[in-house]
Amino acid sequence: MKKVVIAGGGQAASSVAAKLRSEGFDGSIAIICKENHPPYQRPPLSKKYLLGEMTLDRLYLRPLSYYDDQNITLHLGKTVDQIDRAKKQVLFVGENLEYDDLVLALGSQPRRLPEKIGGSLGKVFTVRDLTDVDALAPEFTRDKRVLIIGGGYIGLEAAAVAAQRGLKVTLVEMADRILQRVAALQTSDYFRHLHTTHGVEIKEGVSLARLTGHEGTVTGAELSDGTLIEIDFAIVGVGIFPVTDIASDAGLSISDGITVNAFGQTSDPSIWAAGDCCAFPYRGGELRLESVPHAIDQAELVAQNIMGASLSYFPKPWFWSDQYDVKLQITGLNTGFDNVITRSTNETSISFWYY
């Protein structure tokens, strides 16, 4: 009986397992997940879950009963420590599992502030998993002062929730504009206006110099323009990096993530990767995407290829973000355009077309 082991517990991991079963795979499937929860949705963490509008059970991608019904073994609260490619085994907490095919769906981790500028102070939060958000949620009480470092999706979504909860929000973005890495100027302008009308103070072209604290807890911040502000807590949203350590330790090829070919195979043909953690061929170069649709699409392709399909992956980049009562949807990449067309059918809908 063929054995598939999946390292990781997010959207890609769940999608590989589900697609294998739906395609008729009758071998064993095991998912090794470092969290104590089955695979769950991450996007709502900084939106509806943080607002208290979504319960934990609704976060789960599939109920626990699904894994039992589909004969998928979950190893929760476990982390893969080592891959033995010669023996085709993964080792974790004194156990080992043999595999015929191993899928690395390791995801990514948030970048943290260096300790020397206050990154280790208490009440300095990231927003990546349930543990992060469960620790952060009690801070969201009216009139508290929060500094948000980073003007990407996570920072802006957290700012929206904080403003809706009546907090005093300052957001700093070291680039010239918010959303600079992921969206064009017109989109940045729209969301800057949206946030400022909700009372968020946005400082662009300004970075954090250092956080200050008292008795180990953050109490203030010094910005690069010399501004000093008093705060009750801080949220760091300065990007993520792919988890590649166990792949690197196993001698697999690493670039901006775990390197895979068009089929999703790593430099070891019996080891595959999908989602945030891997970089794949794209138009003569290499690309790594951080989005739920990509994680699902690539994971399902990997599952089909494990079963012999030999399909090549070509992404359909699609991203979304919910802020206040506005939904941002982006299709395509923020590169290689010369012209922008603005279209608006009513006061609540606007679109920007880049070509």
Model-based region annotation:
Residues 120-141, 214-222, 227-304:
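FAD-site-proximal beta/loop scaffold in flavoenzymes
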